[in-house]
Amino acid sequence: LGLETKQRYTFSVQKANNGSSNPTLVYIRGVAMTAKTMDELVSLCKRRGFIYQSNELYGGLQGLYDYGPLGVELKNNLKQAWWRSMVYDRDDVEGLDASVLTSPKVLQYSGHEDTFTDPLIDCRSCNSRWRADDLVELRCPSCNSEDLTEPRPFNLMFKTNIGPVDDGKSFAYLRPETAQQIFTNFKNVLDSTSRNLPFGIAQIGKAFRNEVTPRNFIFRTREFEQMELEFFVAPGTDEKWLDFWVQTRLKWWVDQGIDPKNLELYKVKNDELSHYSKTTIDIMYGFPHGLEELEGIANRTDFDLGSHTKGQTELNIKS
C-alpha cells in the first residue's frame, strides 16, 4: 500500500469551500489575513515570508519556489507532525532517507520510463505547448488558434549526467517520486531490522517532475516534497489495510485542524489509475479554485516488488 502526501498542497490554506466565494485564510502569528483571490494569496505569502519565486532576482524559474522564514517553519511543523504520527507513534514502521539521484534501471523496472508521461500538444501558430487534458476546448489559450498538433506523450522525468564524461550512457534521473527507493531498499531494511509482515517504510524527500504547464502557484510545480509510506502486508489482506489507512489518514488531517466539511474521499476511476495501482483513494480538499488532492492512498499489490525482483534472483525476494 502506498501513501503519498503531497506537501506542495498544504502549506497555508486553512479554510475554503469548493466553488464558493469564501476567502482563503492564512494565519500569521495569530492574525488572520484574508486573501480573496489566488493573486492576493501569492502576494500575501511573499510579503509575509512564506514563499518567494525561485531565482526571482534573475527573472525567476517557472514552477519553482523558495520557502521563506515562516514558510520553512510551517513546512517543518507539518513534516514533524507527519513523521511523529507515522513512525514514532507506531511500532510497525521504519524510516528511510534515500538518494534523489536514481539509476535508470530502477525506473525501467518500475515502468516509469514507459508510462510516466503527460499528453503534450503544440500550437503551430505561436509555438506554445500545453497539456492536452488541461485544454477545455481544442484552442490555444495563448493565441486562440485552432491549429494544434495531435497529442503525444511527454516524459516528465529530469535527466542528469553522472561523472565527467557526457557520453549519453552515464546518466541518472532526478526521482519523480519517493516510492521507488523504498522498494529497492526493501530487503536491506528487512535484513537489518528483522521485521515481519505487516510493516511499513516511511520517507520524506524531494521529487522532481518536468511539468508541461506548472500552474496555480505551488499546486503544480517542478520540484516539491512528498511524505511517503509504503506498507507491506500479507497476500489477501490488502483491501482491509487499504480501508484502515484511508480512515487513519483522514482522521490525521482532521486532527491537524482541518474542517471535515472541506475534506472529501474520491475513488479514482479504473481508466484514471496509475500503472501500478489496483485501487486508489484520494483525500481531496475544497480549495477556492476547486477540489485538489491532499493525499493519495493506493493499493499497489505486488507490482513494485514484483517488478524490481523479476529477473533479479540474487535479491531473493518473493512477492
Language-model features and meaning:
Residues 10, 15-32:
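Short, Lys/Arg-enriched N-terminal segments with co-localized hydrophobic residues
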Residues 4-9:
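Short, low-complexity segments with poor structural confidence in diverse proteins
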